[in-house]
């Protein structure tokens, strides 16, 4: 599962949303707001660590435009990808493979800060592979993602994603 897919899973668990949840979290911010997330995948043979910094470039009533820079470490090797711009529509994506499995509230510590989060549990099946996850979201962090964990039949350990730094303007 890629970082983009993971973030999409985090934001697409409502049933069915009237406004794209990813847009809603960015629309609460001003241009220049950013979040740095770290994702860790254990493959059994090596750990893969991805760090992504997403910055809000523009927000309008119709869309939010963000740019993400990503660096991935495969063991001792590091690969930096070119910055990628993305337009996040205010309209929800009708192709939602998620099945909500639970929703609650929880206070967690992320980047040394206590945050009250909305917790979503979900299940999905894509390309014949079943997976499930749990995501903690908050309007305190640009983009909304505080922390997520995903498991699937083919992963030897859960994939973990967590916000490590951010600035909300």
Task: Walk through the language-model features, giving the residues of each.
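Acidic, serine/threonine-rich low-complexity disordered tracts
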Residues: 15-169
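Sec-dependent N-terminal signal peptides
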Residues: 1-13
